[in-house]
Amino acid sequence: MSTSTQNIPWYRHLNRAQWRAFSAAWLGYLLDGFDFVLIALVLTEVQSEFGLTTVQAASLISAAFISRWFGGLLLGAMGDRYGRRLAMVSSIILFSVGTLACGFAPGYTTMFIARLVIGMGMAGEYGSSATYVIESWPKHLRNKASGFLISGFSVGAVVAAQVYSLVVPVWGWRALFFIGILPIIFALWLRKNIPEAEDWKEKHAGKAPVRTMVDILYRGEHRIINILMTFAAAAALWFCFAGNLQNAAIVAGLGLLCAVIFISFMVQSSGKRWPTGVMLMLVVLFAFLYSWPIQALLPTYLKTELAYDPHTVANVLFFSGFGAAVGCCVGGFLGDWLGTRKAYVCSLLASQILIIPVFAIGGTNVWVLGLLLFFQQMLGQGIAGILPKLIGGYFDTDQRAAGLGFTYNVGALGGALAPILGALIAQRLDLGTALASLSFSLTFVVILLIGLDMPSRVQRWLRPEALRTHDAIDDKPFSGAVPLGSGKGAFVKTKS
């Protein structure tokens, strides 16, 4: 940028169409967060009406994880072939229809299927909205685009909690799901009123349709075995998260089977760049493993170990959720200032200073605990707002929506594993110590994976002929693309 351009406030670099594109995607992501937490809010009411066991009730939450990876793949491929806008609109309609179906569900099976549909739509919304906004904004503002967008999810969760308190006591739990019709109306408005992403339009102007991840996996020479592996992965995930398996060896075996299938899909779809894709799945997996024990078990910790009443628990959780939302926006500024990877590492290192005090001070001072949680979540959880920008930079425009959607939502299975890990450790330690230990140790794994740019580094080690040296989104160099000690001149920009 020129000196005169740098003196212009960042928000003036955006035209009306770009702001409209962001606003539409942000609202879509807010609705995604809204729909995601509805089942958790009314789970006890649903369990009581349908006569479900605790395991069956919990499986309604896990159902979304079972289908997310496939939704990311399918709707991401739609975004790569037909445009980000259509994929985003389709995702919103899909999770809205699933939410509406939950309201009409006569029993467990119907609601479980509806939750599978919601999971697919959620996954597609993440990949399509993120790529849509990032590719619509100027390159030097794309960390802000990513961070601001992801903040919508936290806002949606807060809105859902408020709507729950107003609707359910008066009209019952089904009325909360009937609100799912509203996003469909919003999606129809989007279809007519927002432009296509600039990067996608430029890449596809006058060119033949690209070969998407769906084409490679389900229309290629290995389509039969890939279809069988898809059903095998879905069945394995169902048994792991909803089948009430008690044998740890069987669960581990099914998890290993899923890992082999997902890596196989990545190898087939990414070609020589499969090491990058596999490492990105690991980055996301550990990102969920360090953050989700606190997300899932913090309410339990506050109620059981600190003996807080429900009102106090709600207040503390507000600090936590609001901190994460603010952190997404702060992360966007940090990313554009320091660079995506450096901002991620610095923010996580700062969060490490706070994680031990959060669980060490006890519950004597609610305000101090709330403030500590606010800043810890702002730095540790909020920085994940620029994760779509980080992942998307490793993929060309032709494969970005499916690549981002698939890698993120496979890694997101860590969100289902994390509470289990926390609970297992809590059998030997108190819950607060378990959460602090798990988060503190696994955060360092993410710091190393991102700080050392392991996706590029492993790519260079295994398949150097397909190495990308520069970020495909903002053209900044990848530190792991050259051996340690090499000068800046070693960077040779690859063709995107």
From Swiss-Prot:
N-terminal signal peptide: none
UniProt record, GO biological process: carboxylic acid transport
UniProt cross-references to PROSITE patterns, sorted A to Z: MFS (PS50850)
Record field: catalytic activity: N-acetylneuraminate(in) + H(+)(in) = N-acetylneuraminate(out) + H(+)(out)
Pfam family, one: MFS_1
Subcellular localization(s) per the UniProt record: Cell inner membrane
This protein's UniProt keywords: Cell inner membrane, Cell membrane, Membrane, Sugar transport, Transmembrane, Transmembrane helix, Transport
Transmembrane segments annotated in the record for this chain: 22-42, 58-78, 86-106, 116-136, 148-168, 170-190, 224-244, 247-267, 278-298, 313-333, 353-373, 374-394, 406-426, 431-451
Membrane disposition: Multi-pass membrane protein
UniProt record similarity statement: Belongs to the major facilitator superfamily. Sialate:H(+) symporter (SHS) (TC 2.A.1.12) family.
Protein name: Sialic acid transporter NanT
